[in-house]
A protein has these predicted regions:
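Conserved Walker A/P-loop ATP-binding site and its immediately adjacent core
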Residues: 4-9, 19-42
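Short, well-ordered alpha-helices that flank and scaffold nucleotide-derived cofactor binding pockets
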Residues: 12-16, 38, 110-113
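Short glycine-/polar-rich loops that comprise or flank the Walker A/P-loop
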Residues: 20-21, 86-87, 114-117, 164-168
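Hydrophobic/aromatic beta-strand patches that form the interior of the parallel beta-sheet core
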Residues: 24, 65, 91, 119, ...
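Inter-Walker segment of RecA-like/P-loop motor cores
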Residues: 41-77
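SF2 helicase catalytic motif II
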Residues: 69, 81-120, 124-127
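Interdomain helical connector at the RecA1-RecA2 junction of SF1/SF2 helicase-like NTPases
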Residues: 130-210
């Protein structure tokens, strides 16, 4: 929700100023297209989440479209032509998915290089493989590994400072537990000390028994 709100605020400002005239949103899955369209509608931006590659022209009532990365890869030339036709803001949601396949990365670059503005979003600015993420700058660290360079990062500490998230606390518990088994034997164990899975489970049940 945080990334979406930020991106739509940027889109609203750019549309209002005339810097862009259309918005293209690219996301990993079909259902996310509809989520983006619903969120955009709440701020007065009309996005078509049902746009298909065979459709051709976009309806005049829409400010833009929502696409999947796979949809772009299926016809990059079509989406490049659309991007060329109007001053376009392209929002690339979860951009790290753009490196899922070589063809996807190539298609995204082909389709959206002409965009007036590009906004790439991700909460995961890295990949477990070495596939490059489209439109992302990399810089080698001391070990020689390439690290992505964000234009702007907003982390947990920032959100905590701004009061938009609650602090996460991990509580440690300890204590001596005593219980009787079904056979009538009395067992004692202390939470926080090394125990077998079975003993730990029984000790927790005892501790949480109202």
């Amino acid at each position: 929700a945080g990334k979406t709100t930020f991106a739509l605020r940027v889109a609203t400002e750019l549309l209002s100023s005339g810097d862009v005239h259309k918005v293209t949103i690219v996301c990993p899955t079909e259902h996310l297209k509809y989520q983006w369209a619903e969120a955009a509608a709440r701020v007065g931006i009309h996005i078509d989440p049902s746009y298909s590659n065979s459709q051709g022209a976009l309806g005049s009532r829409f400010d833009g479209v929502a696409l999947t990365y796979a949809q772009v890869a299926a016809n990059a030339n079509l989406h490049r032509a659309r991007t060329d036709q109007a001053r376009t803001l392209v929002i690339l949601d979860e951009i790290h998915h753009g490196g899922d396949a070589l063809s996807w990365g190539d298609a995204i670059r082909e389709a959206f290089t002409p965009a007036r503005r590009r906004l790439a979003l991700t909460g995961t600015p890295f990949r477990s493989d070495t596939s490059p993420i489209p439109f992302v700058r990399y810089k080698e660290d001391a070990s020689g590994a390439k690290r992505s360079q964000a234009d702007y990062s907003y982390g947990y500490s920032d959100a905590l400072r701004d009061g938009v998230v609650r602090p996460v606390m991990f509580m440690s518990y300890s204590g001596q537990m005593r219980w009787r088994t079904k056979a009538g034997d009395e067992v004692a164990a202390r939470l926080g000390e090394p125990l077998t899975k079975d003993l730990e489970s029984q000790a927790w049940r005892t501790a949480l028994d109202p």
